[in-house]
């Protein structure tokens, strides 16, 4: 019942999940979408489909700029959708053009601490930006660079190490109506 009310208040607006790699966007996103009766899209999966290769291969063969171009292209298509929860890549916030697409929906920042991200990403060989000798230093630098950009989100959701993804989705659902009320009031004035 509460989900029906939230769906009505959202009026089909997309939810964009942003945050560092390892913050759980691709895990929480489908749960949130299911509870809302929305579709779920993982931008990284779509980028791989468009490119016809894995993200690691895009970085290795074509470079980060090509990956970011594909990311912007895919995000533009996703922003045109409605009733969707979209898990974005961690660096989506780096390009100003991407923000014009993100602002077509509600932007939710899943904010994980450096310690939490380190624990989740240790030994992950699929992420090209993390193939370095000092993972903690690399993650810390990326986090410092991106935090001010993530802070532009409509909602910051601080993550705890022991949180269940389903509980996170539930807490987000409970928070969303409070974000929408001011938007509705502003439109009526």
Swiss-Prot record:
GO terms for biological process: amino acid biosynthetic process; aromatic amino acid family biosynthetic process; chorismate biosynthetic process. ATP binds at residues 22-27, 127. It is found in: Cytoplasm. Its main location: cytoplasm. It catalyses: shikimate + ATP = 3-phosphoshikimate + ADP + H(+). Its EC number is 2.7.1.71. GO terms for cellular component: cytoplasm. Monomer. This is Shikimate kinase. It comes from Synechocystis sp. (strain ATCC 27184 / PCC 6803 / Kazusa). The gene is aroK.
């Amino acid at each position: 019942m509460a989900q029906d009310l939230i769906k009505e208040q959202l009026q089909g607006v997309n939810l964009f999940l942003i945050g560092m790699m390892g913050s759980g966007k691709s895990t929480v996103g489908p749960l949130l979408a299911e509870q809302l009766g929305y579709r779920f899209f993982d931008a990284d999966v779509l980028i791989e489909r468009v490119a016809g290769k894995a993200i690691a291969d895009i970085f290795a063969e074509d470079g980060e700029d090509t990956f970011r171009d594909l990311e912007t292209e895919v995000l533009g298509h996703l922003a045109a959708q409605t009733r969707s929860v979209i898990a974005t890549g961690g660096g989506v916030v780096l390009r100003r053009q991407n923000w014009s697409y993100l602002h077509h929906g509600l932007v939710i920042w899943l904010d994980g601490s450096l310690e939490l991200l380190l624990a989740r990403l240790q030994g992950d060989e699929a992420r090209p930006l993390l193939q370095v000798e000092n993972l903690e230093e690399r993650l810390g630098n990326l986090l410092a660079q991106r935090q001010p950009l993530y802070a532009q989100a409509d909602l910051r959701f601080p993550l705890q190490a022991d949180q269940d993804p389903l509980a996170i989705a539930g807490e987000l659902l409970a928070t969303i109506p409070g974000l929408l009320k001011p938007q509705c009031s502003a439109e009526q004035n």
